[in-house]
A protein has these predicted regions:
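Outer-membrane beta-barrel proteins
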Residues: 2-164
Length: 164
């Protein structure tokens, strides 16, 4: 199973993408996205044609929950983004930074990948979004969460995003 997930992740990265635990969304100003996934929920809003602010709540198997406030800044179109934010957990709060890449939408699909790191963790996610309706996307992803102390958490997830 791990080999299949890693092969899928590598193929999607060759297609060129990156992300935070919430999927990377391509939005227009002033669009808002609300999403629910296997272990997370989030809301984000495109405040300018280059900047998106967001808030995410995620439930970790071993480490309790964490809450993220973040900013994504489009560097090259909406395909390359810089990410910065702050994560609140049970006792280990962290500033973090990273990068996200996403592919242009083709036949209703766009792929993405991201990497973020803080003082006590790093996290990678690769995934694909499929447009189901005009403003509803289905998301499938693989994530790898590595705290500096403790066990790694990785797995496959799915979610729904509504944009308005």
């Amino acid at each position: 199973m791990k080999k299949i997930a890693m092969l899928t992740a590598a193929m999607m990265m060759l297609g060129a993408s990156s992300v935070l635990a919430a999927p990377i969304n391509q939005m227009a100003e002033p669009e808002t996205a609300v999403g629910v996934g296997t272990k997370e929920s989030y809301i984000e809003h495109k405040i300018t044609n280059k900047a998106t602010i967001g808030y995410q709540y995620a439930d970790r198997d071993e480490y309790g929950d964490h809450k993220d406030a973040y900013l994504q800044y489009d560097v090259v179109g909406s395909e390359v983004k810089l990410i910065g934010g702050y994560r609140w957990t049970d006792g280990k709060d962290n500033a973090f930074g990273g990068v996200a890449l996403s592919t242009p939408r083709v036949m209703g699909f766009d792929a993405y990948a991201s990497y973020v790191a803080g003082k006590d963790f790093n996290e990678t996610q690769v995934g694909i979004n499929k447009n189901l309706l005009l403003n509803v996307d289905l998301n499938a992803n693989y994530h790898n969460f590595k705290p500096d102390h403790g066990h790694h958490e990785n797995g496959v997830g799915a979610g729904i995003t509504v944009k308005f």
